């Protein structure tokens, strides 16, 4: 099963968890044969409990096993997200915008 990493800002704002949950619901409605990996859902509870370098290591441990990354425009412009994006670039993990991914997926379903 394909694994796609969702690169979205958390910053300790729990409304972002709800927003990402809504994105995941849309993504799953398009393609149920993909595992959408959300570090915010997995590690959000650690956000203010561990230092940022350890938090980054947790995120990269997930990202390195993913086939692709989806970014969310301005919501992917934080230092943490940029670190993850740079990891993808360095390791040739494809990066695509959420809107473009949805358009491409819908096009392929037709």
Residue ranges of predicted features:
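Conserved catalytic or regulatory cores that recognize and/or transform ribose-phosphate-containing ligands
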Residues: 1-110
């Amino acid at each position: 099963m394909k694994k796609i990493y969702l690169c979205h800002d958390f910053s300790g704002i729990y409304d972002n968890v709800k927003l990402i949950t809504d994105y995941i619901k849309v993504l799953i409605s398009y393609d149920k044969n993909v595992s959408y990996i959300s570090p915010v859902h997995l590690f959000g509870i650690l956000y203010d409990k561990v230092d940022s370098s350890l938090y980054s290591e947790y995120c990269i441990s997930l990202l390195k096993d993913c086939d692709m990354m989806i970014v969310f425009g301005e919501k992917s412009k934080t230092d943490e997200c940029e670190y993850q994006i740079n990891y993808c670039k360095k390791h040739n993990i494809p990066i695509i915008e959420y809107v473009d991914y949805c358009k491409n997926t819908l096009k392929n379903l037709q």
